[in-house]
Amino acid sequence: MYKVYLKPNKEESLKRFHPWVFSGAIAHFDGEPEEGEVVEIYTSKKEFIAKGHFQIGSIAVRVLTFRQEEEINADFWKRKLSIAYDMRRSIGIAGNPTNNTYRLVHGEGDNLPGLVIDIYARTAVMQAHSAGMHLDRMAIADALTEVMGSQIDNIYYKSETTLPFKADLYPENGFLKGGSTDNVAMEYGLKFHIDWLKGQKTGFFVDQRENRSLLERYAKGRSVLNMFCYTGGFSVYAMRGDAKLVHSVDSSAKSIDLTNKNIEPNFPGDTRHAAYAEDAFKYLDRMGDQYDLIVLDPPAFAKHRDALRNALQGYRKLNVKAFEKIKPGGILFTFSCSQAVSKENFRTAVFTAAAMSGRSVRILHQLTQPADHPVSIYHPEGEYLKGLVLYVE
C-alpha cells in the first residue's frame, strides 16, 4: 500500500477527523498510486493518521478509516453498511411500512465519502462520486446484498455523470444485481414513479421528504404553485393536504410527464391539478397573484464556489418575483441545494429579495435535509440543503 506524506502541520484537520486531504497539504508520495487505490496517510514525522481512496484533484484523499489495523475489505464494507442501515432502522426510517424510499448511505455523513445509496422499494440505486468507490462497486454491492437480504432484489449502478472529469474512468450505468424495471415506491403512503434510469440524481429527491410532509400541513384551502416541480413531489403532498388547486411548473416536458404520472395514481381524475412546461422566470413574470402558497426548489445554481456570485443573484431574482406575486397572508417555501451556498449566503439573498419587494415577511421554519442524510459533526460541509418557510403579509 502506497504512503502519502503531509507537509508539516497539515495534519490538524485530520486529527479532528475531517475526512478530506487536499492536494496542497501533501508533501510527497512513496510511489505512484493509481486513482482509486487505498493509500495510507502519514504526518511529516511519519506518524500514521488514516487510510483512504486516492484521487487526482483538489481533494486528493477521501478518508475511509482512522484505524491503521482496519483493512478495506469485504468485512469493512459489510460493517459500514450495517451501521448505516441500523441507524436508519433505529430512528424509524428503514423498515417503515408507509415509507420504502430513503437514503441508506450519505457519503461523508456515513463515513463513506464518495458513496451514495438510495433505496426505492426493492431497488437500491448506487452512485459513486470518487474513483475509489467506483473501483470498489462490486464489493460494495456484495456487502449491500448481505446487509439488506431479502429486502432488495435489484442494485442499479448510476455513475456515468458523477465521477470527476479528471478521473480516467468510463463507468457505465446498469444493474449490478437483478434487472427489474418496477419503479413504483412509497413515501408516507403516497406512490411515486422513480426514474432511476434517466432521472436526475438517483431518480428522486429523497432529501425533501420531511419538507414535503410539512407543506402538506399548510396546503389546506390554499392555491399552490410548485416551481421546478421535477417529479411533482410537493404537488402530490399539497393535493393530499386538501389544497384548493395545485399548479406544477418545470421547463422540462419530461418532468411534467413524470409529475402527472405521480399525481394520477394518488388522485385519479382529480381536476385540482394542472402542470405547465415553461421557464420558471417567464411563468412568474406572466402569472397574476392567484397563489397563496409557492414552492421554489430550483436545481443547484452553484455547483462550485466560482459560480457563487451569479447563484446568489439568481436566488434574489427568483425570490423577488415570488414575493411580488404571492397573495397577502401567503406562505413561501424557498430552498437552495447548492453546497457552495452557505446558510448565511442563502438567507441574505432571501432577505434582500424581501426588502426589494417591500413586503413584510416572517420566518416560520428553517429547514434542512432529513435524518437519512446525516451530517458528520467533523464535516460541516455535508449540510447542503437550506430552506425557509416564510409568512408574507
Predicted regions and their residues:
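Non-catalytic substrate-recognition/targeting regions of SAM-dependent transferases
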Residues: 105-118, 134-205, 213
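Mobile active-site "lid"/loop adjacent to the S-adenosyl-L-methionine
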Residues: 291-321
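Non-catalytic accessory regions of SAM-dependent methyltransferases
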Residues: 1-119
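Conserved SAM-binding loop of SAM-dependent methyltransferases across substrates and taxa
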Residues: 231-243
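S-adenosyl-L-methionine
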Residues: 252-295
